[in-house]
């Protein structure tokens, strides 16, 4: 079996497992909590992800593109910059909490956002060995670690929700997942451990590479999370919570497609660039066509069955999430086709 096929299988297994866990937790949590709680959590997640996107300087991508995997000055500098970024992002998120609570008229945000921000701090300590594993298309260990961390965080969230019946319980999952994931990555992945170091030449390479990454991630933030900010401000808390459930379910096939593209297809593109032969380009085009058709088919099926599926799986409070999910799938079809 080729390395790319093996990687695709592990990514697929990881995504199926992750989406299965997420769906199971959604079924349980929608019975423990109220729709407004999921709207508040959607805003928290959007703010946290937006901060991560607009501050993305391309450290991960630069390591993937760097031809020398043994350059410790480069790797240690990237890890140190990542640590600093995590500290800064956490501080910014904490400072934004009362502002966000006022803008969206949600007192829970003042508590939930600082809790979720701890995940940004912890993620900054992720080892560069994880990126090197992705570069080698060695996805087995990271995939198992991601699933274990997700399972642990879901258990923590369900326990907190059952005990408190508060929206704040949902925010606990972000730092718990980050702590479990980063800890396991440091323990399980083999290789040289990162240490704090700043090399001026390496910093310059990261800055040069990150200019274009930052611009693209800002655009991704606006496209991917702009709806949450608009709807969070204009819809009622209950309606926005139902929309958040619909978006989460409709996004399952879309997220799977993007995860596969980001992890495997990028290596196929790199191989085609490194070996610019007609055969390599033909293989790349064939892989891209299969990927696109598969993604479109999965999203189309999800859109068709969403109303009936949500009607069966969720209680009547979330019935409107069905047609919402179908409409979202139409938008996702255009996104993937483009």
Would you name each region that the model predicts?
Residues 4-5, 65-71, 121-147, 168, ...:
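Membrane-interface junctions at transmembrane-helix termini in multi-pass inner-membrane proteins
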